[in-house]
């Protein structure tokens, strides 16, 4: 039996109690095109054969799914835009390192408060960082 040992009774990832986005998504994936994305079913990555139909929204079970999807999309294309800008400018390794550190500090080290929604704070921060990096 090739049953995934990490699936719980509901056949969902049981590795992490809050099921991070990547775990919630599996066995789905995202196909990014034209500044958007769509969900795809990864059939070769999951050995389970008796799959049942379920709506993506129900499978993901993420509060405020529309805002979450906007966040995922904005973040993905922000990173792509920064990478393209650095390539176009033929940025040095030192410049790339400085920008990576700046992005890490702004989005991972600088906290997000609880008084305002994460998504609103992220959007504001993304706008500020884009103004600096993508002039």
What do the predicted segments below correspond to?
Residues 1-3, 7-135:
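Short loop/turn segments that flank or connect secondary-structure elements
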């Amino acid at each position: 039996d090739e049953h995934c040992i990490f699936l719980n009774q509901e056949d969902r990832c049981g590795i992490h109690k809050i099921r991070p986005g990547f775990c919630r998504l599996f066995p789905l994936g995202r196909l990014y095109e034209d500044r958007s994305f769509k969900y795809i079913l990864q059939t070769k990555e999951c050995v389970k054969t008796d799959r049942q139909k379920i709506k993506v929204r129900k499978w993901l079970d993420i509060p405020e799914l529309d805002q979450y999807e906007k966040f995922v999309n904005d973040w993905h294309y922000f990173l792509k835009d920064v990478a393209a800008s650095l390539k176009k400018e033929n940025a040095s390794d030192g410049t790339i390192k400085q920008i990576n550190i700046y992005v890490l500090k702004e989005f991972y080290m600088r906290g997000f408060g609880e008084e305002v929604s994460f998504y609103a704070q992220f959007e504001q921060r993304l706008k500020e960082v884009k103004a600096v990096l993508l002039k």
